[in-house]
């Protein structure tokens, strides 16, 4: 379908930068979620790609075609970008049936498209179906009520779905009354003759597109009733709402209304489908069901999906790529598990994961064998072993070079014509350290930091309190959910959150020995917030 590329895209209002110098590529057939806290710029980014918001500067291309370029003065209107938009509010017409809601946009399409011999196409399809009357009879027999009477409405819907035809063709097919055992060989012959007569009048190809001098003839035209109906039936089958075509939105549940909105968006066959928190109005159970539906929809349509959400669970379960933003700046663009297991910085580690990651401040220095000796949690000793060979002095040297390059790039940008200083300044993420006597982290001034100041990121699932460890902890709180329990443990004044799988019950105040398992403990640079590496942590 479509590949989307954003190059140095910026959107600002005055000095406030909603999106700041964003560059990213959304590959064809990708499912990308724009994730981040409220006000981070994700909806603004979506609206700029769709053409509903004009960027301040930058370049956007869809399928290699520029739709916005500030330097060349290009700004293609939203209705010409061939994209679909699904909103949080379903925006269904209350006075229209489901069928009318889906077909409304199709009836307004007027563009250049091939001329088609619809009479020949429908006649050929009918002849093909009538050559096997026993199959039609079998389909019709399934539509009898308990009294043995044939239900015409049900029969027509069944014929539409079985043979992928429009309601108009289905009505003609039903009119032959094959259930009465009629011989339709003469009708088949007449239909085939009709097709040949149309071909002689003006030749057409296998798709019944009219030919002129061997080329497909085109014209600026609207869609016919037949084409509209086929599109409506196609998308209704995809989202499974064929049985609701004659109902009004008020007669549908929230999930059914959402399916109608999705069908309406898919009907014009957009090259890209944009979704702005479409599931936020649904209850938790229905939201989970619709996630599965969106996954299936992405596979069946083969379209490029761009999905905005602040719910990291939705992003993790739906996306092939996550675009994580904060304060208008791209923090990380990677696959969901990559963001979870190898977050780029403290913000990414904190935002993705439920329960949230544990942050532990530490002082550390690297020994000659490569491991890092740490002092943490008010004097406890630990050893961190990197998953790959690491030389901390070299890492800090590269960090300083990159930060200097960023500063020079920002300085050069500030010297450009039209540059406006950013009021919402970018700052290193202020992580939260959970304590028994919790207090606002903002009231403490940040101390002078050195390269020995580090932060450990410990996911709840790697905390173990069921085996042998070296550090005593106390159960501060426990929330069993059946298959697992979320616990808070206290070490001195510090609190750590863990997830223990199984049906073990924990008593508040009970003592346990804490251990850290696995090799996914993260080591961050405290001054820049960047992740240095991952590895194992041994508490001594």
Placement of each model-derived feature along the sequence:
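Internal alpha/beta loop-helix hairpins
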Residues: 304, 309-422
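Conserved ABC transporter NBD signature motif
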Residues: 58-70, 119-124, 128-131
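Helix-to-loop junction immediately C-terminal to a conserved catalytic motif
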Residues: 50
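ABC ATPase nucleotide-binding domains
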Residues: 100-104, 108, 206-207, 215-347
């Amino acid at each position: 379908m479509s590949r989307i590329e954003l190059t140095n895209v910026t959107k600002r209002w005055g000095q406030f930068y909603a999106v700041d110098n964003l560059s990213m590529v959304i590959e064809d057939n990708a499912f990308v979620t724009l994730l981040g806290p409220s006000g981070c710029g994700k909806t603004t980014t979506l609206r700029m790609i769709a053409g509903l918001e004009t960027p301040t500067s930058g370049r956007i291309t869809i399928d290699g075609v520029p739709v916005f370029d500030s330097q060349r003065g290009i700004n293609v209107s939203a209705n010409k970008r061939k994209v679909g938009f699904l909103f949080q509010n379903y925006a269904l017409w209350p006075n229209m049936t489901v069928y009318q809601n889906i077909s409304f946009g199709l009836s307004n399409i007027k563009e250049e498209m091939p001329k088609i011999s619809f009479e020949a196409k429908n006649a050929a399809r009918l002849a093909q179906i009538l050559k096997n009357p026993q199959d039609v009879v079998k389909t019709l027999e399934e539509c009898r009520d308990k009294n043995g009477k044939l239900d015409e409405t049900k029969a027509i819907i069944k014929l539409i779905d079985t043979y992928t035809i429009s309601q108009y063709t289905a009505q003609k097919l039903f009119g032959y009354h094959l259930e009465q055992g009629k011989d339709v060989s003469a009708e088949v012959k007449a239909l085939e003759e009709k097709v040949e007569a149309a071909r002689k009048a003006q030749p057409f190809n296998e798709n019944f597109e009219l030919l002129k001098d061997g080329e497909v003839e085109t014209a600026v035209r609207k869609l016919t009733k037949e084409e509209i109906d086929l599109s409506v039936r196609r998308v209704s089958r995809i989202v499974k709402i064929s049985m609701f075509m004659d109902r009004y939105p008020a007669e549908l549940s929230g999930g059914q209304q959402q399916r109608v909105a999705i069908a309406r968006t898919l009907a014009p066959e957009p090259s890209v489908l944009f979704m702005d928190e479409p599931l936020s109005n649904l209850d938790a159970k229905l939201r989970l069901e619709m996630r599965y539906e969106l996954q299936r929809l992405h596979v069946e349509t083969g379209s490029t999906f761009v999905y905005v959400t602040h719910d990291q669970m939705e992003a993790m379960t739906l996306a092939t790529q996550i675009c994580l933003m904060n304060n208008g700046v791209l923090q990380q663009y990677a696959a969901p598990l990559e963001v979870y297991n190898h977050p780029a910085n403290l913000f990414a580690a904190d935002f993705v994961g439920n329960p949230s990651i544990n942050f532990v401040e530490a002082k550390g220095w690297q020994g000659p064998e490569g491991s890092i000796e740490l002092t943490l949690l008010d004097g406890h000793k630990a050893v961190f072993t990197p998953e790959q060979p690491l030389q901390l002095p070299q890492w800090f040297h590269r960090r300083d070079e990159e930060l200097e390059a960023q500063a020079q790039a920002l300085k050069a940008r500030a010297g450009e014509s039209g540059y406006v200083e950013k009021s919402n300044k970018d700052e290193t993420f202020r992580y939260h350290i959970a304590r028994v006597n919790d207090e606002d982290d903002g009231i403490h001034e940040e101390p002078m930091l050195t390269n020995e100041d580090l932060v450990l990121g410990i996911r709840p699932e790697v905390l173990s309190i069921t085996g042998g460890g070296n550090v005593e902890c106390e159960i501060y709180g426990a929330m069993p959910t059946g298959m697992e329990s979320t616990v808070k443990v206290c070490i001195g004044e510090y609190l750590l959150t863990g997830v223990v799988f199984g049906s073990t019950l924990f008593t508040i105040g009970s003592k346990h020995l804490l251990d850290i398992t696995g090799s996914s403990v993260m080591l961050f640079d405290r001054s820049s917030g960047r992740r240095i590496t991952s590895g194992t942590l041994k508490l001594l």
